[in-house]
C-alpha cells in the first residue's frame, strides 16, 4: 500500500507540474524567460514520473486514483479518476521525455517567433490532454482528452495562420477527426443506454454490441489516420516542425491506437472486428509506404512513414497482441521525434528548403544531425538492436506464427520492405553525394538547444527498446519455437528492401524514362484527395443545382406556383373570350332561340 501511495503521489505531482506553466501569468508577477521555464517544468515532471515507473517495474502494482465526484444524472455517476496501470505508467515518462526534447529544440527553432510563449503553452496543453486521455478511467474523461488533442492539433497545425496552406491543413485535420468523433460518441451513447456507466471496470464486465465496437474502430481510424481518413496526416506538415514531432511521436496520432488497446478486452472476443482492424491496418501500411517512396519533401516522407507505422500498430491490434502494439508506440516515439528534429535542423540550416533533391553532402557539414538521422532511419527499418527492432521483429514473428489472413500478412511484409526503401532514400539524398544547395547557406550546429535534444533522443533510440523489453514482464504469449526462416523473416524482408533501395537510388544517376502512370498514381497519393475533396463537392453542388432548378424552379414555379396559376387563368380566359365572337346576328339568333324554348316549355 505504501508503494502505491508513493507512486500515485509522484504521478499526480508530475501532472501538477505541467499545469503550473499554464497558470504562470496568474501566479507570478516577475518577468522571466517563459519558454525556458516551460522546458524546465517538463524536465522536472519527467524526473518526477520516473519513481512511479521504477516502482512499477519493481512491484508491478497497478492502482486507480479517484479524486472527486463530478456529477450524477439519476443513477448515472461520473467521477474524476485516473487509471495508473501498465499502459499509463510506462507511456507518461516516455511522452514527457520526448516533449522535453521537443521543447528544448523549439527554443532554437522558434526563437524568432513573436508568440513563442503562446506556442509553448499550446504544446504543454497538447501533452496534458494526451496524458488525460492515457490515464482516464472513464469514457467522459477520456473524451475530454480525445477532444483536447484534436483542438490543440487544429491550433498548432494552423500556427502560421498567414499561410493559406496551413489554414487548409488545420481545417482538414479537424474535419477528418470529426468523422472519427461520431464513432466515439456513438459508442458512448450505446454504453450509456445499455451499461448505465462509463467506468472502464463496468464496461469490461459486459459484452459490447458490434455496432459499439465499430464506433471505436471508426474513432481510431480518424484519429490515427488509417486508410480512408488518412489525408490529413501529410497535410499536417504545414505546421512548425516541433508540432510535427510532438504530433507524430507521442500525442495525437497514437491516440486512436491507444483507444483500441485500452478497449482490447472488448475486441478480443469479436473475430469480425479483429479482422476489420487487421485488414484496415495492412491496407494503410502498404498504401502509405508506397506513397512515401515517391515523395520529395523530407517532412512528407517522415509523415507517411508515421502513417505506415500506425498501420502496423493497427495490424498488431488485429492480431490480438495489444501489448506488442503498445511496445511499438513506445519505441516509435523516440526515433520518430528524432527524425522530425533532424529534418527541422536540416530545413532551418538550408533556409527553409524541404526538397531532398536540393540537399546532399550534409554528412560533412552537419555531422551530429546526419548521424542521428541515419540512426533514426535504421531504427525505422528495424535494424537489429535499435529501438524499432524489438517491436517490429516481434510483430512480424507474431504475424507469421498466428492463424491470420495471408493477404494481410503478405502486404504487411511488402510494406516492411518498402520501409527500408524510403528510409535509405532519405539517407542517400540528404546525407550522401555532392551538395546540391546554395553555397552561402549558414550551416552550423553550435547551439546546445539544437544538439542536446537530438543526442538524448538518439540515446533513447539506441537503448530504449532493450530497456523496455528486458525490464517489463511480457504480458503477451511468446512463441517459444518457430522455424528458422520465420525467425529471420523480418531481417530478410528489410535486407531485400535495402537492396532494392540501393538499386533504385543508383538509377537516379542514369537517364531513364520512368513509368508515368505508376509515378503519377503514387505522387498524387492514389488520387484519393482529388476524388474525395473534389468529386464529392462537385456531386453535391451539381445535385443541389439540379434539385433547385428541376424540382423547385420547373415543377413548383412553372406548374404549381405563380407561373402555373397564370397559365391556368390565361387558358380559362382565352376559352371564355373565344366564345365571344362579336357577331350581332348570332347574338339576336341565340336570343330568339332562347325565347322560343322558354315559351314552349312554359
UniProtKB/Swiss-Prot annotation:
One of its GO terms (cellular component) is mitochondrial inner membrane. It catalyses: a ubiquinone + NADH + 5 H(+)(in) = a ubiquinol + NAD(+) + 4 H(+)(out). GO terms for biological process: ATP synthesis coupled electron transport; electron transport coupled proton transport. The gene is MT-ND5. Core subunit of the mitochondrial membrane respiratory chain NADH dehydrogenase (Complex I) that is believed to belong to the minimal assembly required for catalysis. Complex I functions in the transfer of electrons from NADH to the respiratory chain. The immediate electron acceptor for the enzyme is believed to be ubiquinone. GO terms for molecular function: NADH dehydrogenase (ubiquinone) activity. Belongs to the complex I subunit 5 family. Pfam families: NADH5_C (PF06455), Proton_antipo_M (PF00361), Proton_antipo_N (PF00662). The chain crosses the membrane at residues 9-29, 36-56, 86-106, 116-136, 142-162, 173-193, 202-222, 241-261, 273-293, 301-320, 324-344, 361-381, 407-427, 450-470, 482-502, 582-602. Keywords: Electron transport, Membrane, Mitochondrion, Mitochondrion inner membrane, NAD, Respiratory chain, Translocase, Transmembrane, Transmembrane helix, Transport, Ubiquinone. It is found in: Mitochondrion inner membrane. NCBIfam families: NDH_I_L. This is NADH-ubiquinone oxidoreductase chain 5. It is a multi-pass membrane protein. Its EC number is 7.1.1.2. It is an enzyme of class 7 (translocase).
Amino acid at each position: 500500500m505504501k508503494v502505491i501511495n508513493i507512486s500515485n503521489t509522484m504521478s499526480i505531482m508530475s501532472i501538477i507540474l505541467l499545469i503550473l506553466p499554464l497558470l504562470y501569468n496568474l501566479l507570478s508577477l516577475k518577468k522571466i524567460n517563459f519558454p525556458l521555464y516551460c522546458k524546465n517544468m517538463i524536465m522536472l515532471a519527467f524526473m518526477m514520473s520516473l519513481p512511479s515507473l521504477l516502482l512499477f517495474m519493481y512491484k508491478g502494482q497497478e492502482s486507480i486514483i479517484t479524486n472527486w465526484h463530478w456529477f450524477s444524472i439519476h443513477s448515472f455517476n461520473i467521477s474524476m479518476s485516473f487509471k495508473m496501470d501498465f499502459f499509463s505508467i510506462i507511456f507518461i515518462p516516455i511522452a514527457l521525455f520526448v516533449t522535453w526534447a521537443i521543447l528544448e529544440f523549439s527554443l532554437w527553432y522558434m526563437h524568432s517567433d513573436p508568440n513563442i510563449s503562446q506556442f509553448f503553452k499550446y504544446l504543454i496543453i497538447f501533452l496534458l490532454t494526451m496524458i488525460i486521455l492515457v490515464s482516464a478511467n472513464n469514457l467522459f474523461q477520456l473524451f475530454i482528452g480525445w477532444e483536447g488533442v484534436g483542438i490543440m492539433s487544429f491550433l498548432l497545425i494552423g500556427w502560421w495562420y498567414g499561410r493559406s496552406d496551413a489554414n487548409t491543413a488545420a481545417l482538414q485535420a479537424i474535419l477528418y477527426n470529426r468523422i472519427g468523433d461520431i464513432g466515439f460518441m456513438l459508442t458512448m451513447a450505446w454504453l450509456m443506454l445499455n451499461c448505465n456507466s462509463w467506468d472502464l471496470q463496468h464496461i469490461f464486465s459486459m459484452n459490447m454490441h458490434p455496432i459499439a465496437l465499430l464506433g471505436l474502430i471508426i474513432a481510431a481510424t480518424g484519429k490515427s489516420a488509417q486508410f480512408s481518413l488518412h489525408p490529413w496526416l501529410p497535410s499536417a506538415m504545414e505546421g512548425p516542425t516541433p508540432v510535427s514531432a510532438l504530433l507524430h511521436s507521442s500525442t495525437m496520432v497514437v491516440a486512436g491506437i491507444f483507444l483500441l488497446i485500452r478497449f482490447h478486452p472488448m475486441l478480443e472476443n469479436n473475430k469480425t472486428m479483429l479482422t476489420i482492424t487487421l485488414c484496415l491496418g495492412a491496407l494503410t501500411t502498404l498504401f502509405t509506404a508506397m506513397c512515401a517512396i515517391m515523395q520529395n519533401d523530407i517532412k512528407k516522407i517522415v509523415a507517411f512513414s508515421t502513417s505506415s507505422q500506425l498501420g502496423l500498430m493497427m495490424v498488431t491490434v488485429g492480431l490480438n497482441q495489444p501489448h506488442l502494439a503498445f511496445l511499438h508506440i513506445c519505441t516509435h516515439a523516440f526515433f520518430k521525434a528524432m527524425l522530425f528534429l533532424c529534418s527541422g535542423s536540416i530545413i532551418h540550416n538550408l533556409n527553409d528548403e524541404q526538397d531532398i533533391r536540393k540537399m546532399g553532402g550534409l554528412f560533412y557539414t552537419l555531422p551530429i544531425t546526419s548521424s542521428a538521422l541515419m540512426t533514426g532511419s535504421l531504427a525505422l527499418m528495424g535494424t537489429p538492436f535499435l529501438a524499432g527492432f524489438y517491436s517490429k521483429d516481434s510483430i512480424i514473428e507474431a504475424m507469421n506464427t498466428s492463424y491470420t489472413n495471408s493477404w494481410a500478412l503478405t502486404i504487411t511484409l511488402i510494406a516492411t520492405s518498402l520501409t527500408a526503401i524510403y528510409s535509405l532514400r532519405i539517407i542517400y539524398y540528404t546525407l550522401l553525394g555532392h551538395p546540391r544547395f546554395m553555397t552561402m547557406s549558414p550551416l552550423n550546429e553550435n547551439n546546445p538547444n539544437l544538439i542536446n535534444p537530438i543526442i538524448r533522443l538518439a540515446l533513447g533510440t539506441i537503448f530504449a527498446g532493450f530497456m523496455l523489453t528486458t525490464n517489463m514482464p511480457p504480458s503477451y504469449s511468446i512463441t517459444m519455437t518457430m522455424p528458422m526462416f520465420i525467425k529471420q523473416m523480418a531481417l530478410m524482408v528489410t535486407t531485400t528492401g535495402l537492396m532494392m533501395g540501393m538499386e533504385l537510388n543508383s538509377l537516379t544517376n542514369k537517364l531513364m524514362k520512368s513509368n508515368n502512370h505508376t509515378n503519377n498514381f503514387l505522387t498524387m497519393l492514389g488520387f484519393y484527395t482529388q476524388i474525395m475533396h473534389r468529386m464529392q463537392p462537385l456531386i453535391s453542388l451539381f445535385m443541389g443545382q439540379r434539385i433547385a432548378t428541376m424540382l423547385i424552379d420547373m415543377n413548383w414555379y412553372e406548374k404549381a406556383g405563380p407561373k402555373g396559376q397564370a397559365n391556368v387563368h390565361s387558358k380559362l380566359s382565352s376559352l371564355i373570350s373565344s366564345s365571344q365572337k362579336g357577331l350581332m346576328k348570332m347574338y339576336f339568333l341565340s336570343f330568339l332561340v332562347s325565347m322560343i324554348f322558354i315559351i314552349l316549355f312554359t
